[in-house]
Regions:
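Extreme N-terminal starter segment of soluble prokaryotic enzymes
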Residues: 1-2
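Extracellular beta-rich ligand/substrate-recognition surface
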Residues: 6-12
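Glycine-centered loop/turn positions within well-structured domains
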Residues: 11, 40, 93, 112
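Residues that act as N-cap/strand-start positions at coil-to-secondary-structure junctions
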Residues: 12-15, 79
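Extracytoplasmic/periplasmic beta-strand context in beta-sandwich domains
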Residues: 16, 83-84, 103
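Glycine-rich beta-strand-centered segment in the early N-terminal region that forms part
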Residues: 19-37, 44, 48-79, 86, ...
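A glycine-rich, Thr/Ser-enriched phosphate-binding loop motif common to dinucleotide/cofactor-binding enzymes
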Residues: 99-114
Length: 114
Protein backbone atom coordinates (compact mmCIF):
# COMPACT_ATOMS: atom_id res chain seq x y z
CA UNK A 1 0.00 0.00 0.00
CA UNK A 2 1.04 3.63 -0.38
CA UNK A 3 1.57 5.80 2.71
CA UNK A 4 3.02 9.22 3.50
CA UNK A 5 5.80 8.67 6.04
CA UNK A 6 7.68 11.19 8.16
CA UNK A 7 11.25 9.89 8.46
CA UNK A 8 12.65 12.73 10.58
CA UNK A 9 11.04 15.40 12.76
CA UNK A 10 10.52 18.60 10.81
CA UNK A 11 11.31 16.85 7.54
CA UNK A 12 9.15 16.34 4.47
CA UNK A 13 6.63 13.55 4.10
CA UNK A 14 7.71 10.82 1.70
CA UNK A 15 5.34 8.61 -0.31
CA UNK A 16 6.47 5.01 0.22
CA UNK A 17 5.25 1.46 -0.34
CA UNK A 18 4.51 -0.47 2.86
CA UNK A 19 2.94 -3.84 3.66
CA UNK A 20 -0.81 -3.74 4.24
CA UNK A 21 -1.72 -3.67 7.94
CA UNK A 22 -3.32 -6.73 9.49
CA UNK A 23 -6.10 -6.35 12.02
CA UNK A 24 -4.94 -7.11 15.54
CA UNK A 25 -7.27 -8.40 18.25
CA UNK A 26 -10.26 -6.03 18.52
CA UNK A 27 -9.29 -4.07 15.40
CA UNK A 28 -10.59 -3.62 11.88
CA UNK A 29 -8.62 -2.48 8.84
CA UNK A 30 -10.14 0.69 7.40
CA UNK A 31 -9.71 1.47 3.68
CA UNK A 32 -9.03 5.21 3.93
CA UNK A 33 -11.09 7.57 1.75
CA UNK A 34 -10.40 10.93 3.43
CA UNK A 35 -8.11 12.34 6.12
CA UNK A 36 -8.51 15.53 8.12
CA UNK A 37 -5.21 17.31 8.75
CA UNK A 38 -4.94 20.14 11.26
CA UNK A 39 -2.56 21.94 13.59
CA UNK A 40 -2.12 18.86 15.80
CA UNK A 41 -0.69 16.99 12.80
CA UNK A 42 1.69 19.89 12.14
CA UNK A 43 2.86 19.85 15.77
CA UNK A 44 3.30 16.07 15.60
CA UNK A 45 5.48 16.52 12.49
CA UNK A 46 7.68 18.93 14.46
CA UNK A 47 7.83 16.72 17.57
CA UNK A 48 5.96 19.35 19.60
CA UNK A 49 2.61 17.57 20.11
CA UNK A 50 1.49 16.31 23.55
CA UNK A 51 1.96 12.73 22.38
CA UNK A 52 5.44 12.59 20.91
CA UNK A 53 5.92 10.06 18.15
CA UNK A 54 9.35 8.92 17.06
CA UNK A 55 10.07 8.71 13.31
CA UNK A 56 9.43 7.01 11.10
CA UNK A 57 5.65 7.28 11.43
CA UNK A 58 2.57 7.88 9.30
CA UNK A 59 0.73 11.08 10.32
CA UNK A 60 -3.02 11.55 10.16
CA UNK A 61 -5.40 11.09 13.09
CA UNK A 62 -8.85 11.91 11.66
CA UNK A 63 -9.90 9.31 9.11
CA UNK A 64 -12.93 8.29 7.10
CA UNK A 65 -13.10 5.03 5.23
CA UNK A 66 -14.76 1.71 4.61
CA UNK A 67 -14.77 -1.56 6.55
CA UNK A 68 -16.70 -4.45 5.00
CA UNK A 69 -18.78 -2.15 2.78
CA UNK A 70 -19.77 0.30 5.54
CA UNK A 71 -18.38 3.84 5.87
CA UNK A 72 -16.97 4.97 9.24
CA UNK A 73 -15.17 7.93 10.81
CA UNK A 74 -12.48 7.34 13.42
CA UNK A 75 -9.80 9.10 15.42
CA UNK A 76 -6.52 7.17 15.45
CA UNK A 77 -3.18 8.00 17.13
CA UNK A 78 -1.37 7.87 13.75
CA UNK A 79 -1.52 6.20 10.36
CA UNK A 80 -4.29 8.06 8.55
CA UNK A 81 -2.13 9.15 5.61
CA UNK A 82 -2.08 5.62 4.22
CA UNK A 83 -4.36 3.60 2.00
CA UNK A 84 -5.31 1.42 4.98
CA UNK A 85 -5.05 1.76 8.75
CA UNK A 86 -5.83 -0.50 11.71
CA UNK A 87 -8.56 0.97 13.93
CA UNK A 88 -9.92 -0.32 17.26
CA UNK A 89 -13.47 -1.52 16.54
CA UNK A 90 -14.78 0.61 19.42
CA UNK A 91 -13.36 3.74 17.75
CA UNK A 92 -15.38 3.27 14.54
CA UNK A 93 -18.30 5.71 14.20
CA UNK A 94 -20.81 4.43 11.59
CA UNK A 95 -21.75 7.20 9.16
CA UNK A 96 -25.15 7.87 7.61
CA UNK A 97 -25.57 7.23 3.90
CA UNK A 98 -25.32 10.30 1.71
CA UNK A 99 -22.53 11.93 3.72
CA UNK A 100 -19.42 12.36 1.57
CA UNK A 101 -16.01 11.30 2.93
CA UNK A 102 -14.92 14.94 2.81
CA UNK A 103 -17.91 16.03 4.92
CA UNK A 104 -17.55 13.10 7.30
CA UNK A 105 -13.90 13.79 8.15
CA UNK A 106 -15.06 16.83 10.14
CA UNK A 107 -16.89 14.42 12.49
CA UNK A 108 -13.71 12.52 13.28
CA UNK A 109 -12.21 15.61 14.94
CA UNK A 110 -14.95 15.58 17.57
CA UNK A 111 -14.45 11.92 18.53
CA UNK A 112 -12.78 10.98 21.83
CA UNK A 113 -9.10 10.03 21.57
CA UNK A 114 -8.27 6.34 21.21
Amino acid sequence: MKAWVLKRLGGPLELVDLPEPEAEEGEAVLRVEAVGLNFADHLMRLGAYLTRLHPPFIPGMEVVGVVEGRRYAALVPQGGLAERVGVPKGALLPLPEGLSPEEAKALAQSLPPP
